[in-house]
Structure formats: structure tokens, C-alpha cells
């Protein structure tokens, strides 16, 4: 516990808040190129084949990103836009691919929550 005099001399230094999405450099989205597209299995209580992609960003960082929605057209060398947001049951996956932007197509036949999956309004 510091004395009043020590606080007057030094003051308290505010704690640094560690970023949850360090590769974004405080940007809302970042562009990158897929270096590997693959599936992986989630943590213990869940079971599935989750679609993920390793992406090299424009700031030369490599991150693992989740591809949301049913079905995708991504492959190696696809140019994607990513946003922050982790996937709770996939360790190390802290980013999401934005659907319907750049080389990523929107989810086909999507009726609800379309804006999140880049789907156009059905006729």
C-alpha cells in the first residue's frame, strides 16, 4: 500500500488492456489471402467438422479464421475480408471471415439473418 506522499510523487499507472484481436491493429476489418482451408474438430462437449482458414493478412500476420454458414467457395489464394470475433469451441480461432465480400460468396438459400451471411434478398 503506497503512502499519500508516494502517490503524489508517482501517481497510479493505469493498467494496459490487452487486445482480444491483436492482428487487426485497431481496424474493424482486414484483408488477407487464404494460405490453407481445412476443417477441424471443436473442444470437448461438442462434435462437428468446423470450417476454418489460415489467412495471411495485409500486415503480414498469419491468423486462423472461422468460415461461418453452410458451404463455402474458399480455397488457397482466395482473397477474404476478416473481422474480429472468436469461436468459443475452437481454440486459437479469434477471427471470422465476412461472407459475400471479395472472393467469398454469400450463403446460398439463406432466409433469416441474411446480412450476417452476405445473402441477397430472395425474390
Swiss-Prot record:
Name it.
Answer: Small ribosomal subunit protein uS12
Q: Which organism is it from?
A: Sphingopyxis alaskensis (strain DSM 13593 / LMG 18877 / RB2256)
What Gene Ontology biological process does one annotation of this record name? Answer: translation
Could you tell me the superkingdom of the organism this chain comes from?
A: Bacteria
Q: Which residues carry this modification: 3-methylthioaspartic acid?
A: 89
The cross-references to SUPFAM superfamilies, in alphabetical order and at most eight, read: Nucleic acid-binding proteins
State how it assembles: Part of the 30S ribosomal subunit. Contacts proteins S8 and S17. May interact with IF1 in the 30S initiation complex.
Q: Give an example GO molecular function.
A: structural constituent of ribosome
- Gene Ontology cellular-component annotations: small ribosomal subunit
UniProt family annotation: Belongs to the universal ribosomal protein uS12 family.
